[in-house]
Amino acid sequence: MEIQGTRFGTLEFDEKEIIYLNEGLLGFPLSKQFLMFPYGEDSSFFWLQSVDEPEIAFIVINPFDFFSDLEFAVEDEDASSLVLARSEDVEIFTLVTIPEGRPEEMRTNLAGPVVVNVQNRLGKQILCKDYSPRQPLIPDSMRSQLKEQARSSKGGHVAGGR
């Protein structure tokens, strides 16, 4: 199978690679089939590419790579709809937003993780009221350093003169 996307051009894939989000994502109810692939080599980021609407792609992460103390509770109803039998069959991803020109301010939506049953490729975005929908990925101390580095590299120095 293949899709023609605006971001990646032609993507060839096998049907068994599709993740099925039968309820779509919040704000994107028509996108129900997705492909997921690494953002880059050795990256903690992934692309979640809509098969139904090829112009739509999201950056996602495994939030446990960034926040070791997270605990997401999958309600029985959600587990049932995903046909989850074992916790080992679950992978969880969160959507990332990166403000244009301000990557140091990237955030992830911990309040709306996407839960995927890796055995049957069924997924669902669930709601977690205990977490922020705009959780910074970069600690405040590092953000300040990155902003300062960006400012100094933009400003540059003019040499010469009389």
From Swiss-Prot:
One of its GO terms (biological process) is regulation of translation. The keyword Transport does not apply. The keyword Nucleus does not apply. It comes from the Bacteria. Keywords: Bacterial flagellum biogenesis, Chaperone, Cytoplasm, Translation regulation. It is found in: Cytoplasm. GO terms for cellular component: cytoplasm. Belongs to the FliW family. Interacts with translational regulator CsrA and flagellin(s). Acts as an anti-CsrA protein, binds CsrA and prevents it from repressing translation of its target genes, one of which is flagellin. Binds to flagellin and participates in the assembly of the flagellum. This is Flagellar assembly factor FliW. The gene is fliW.
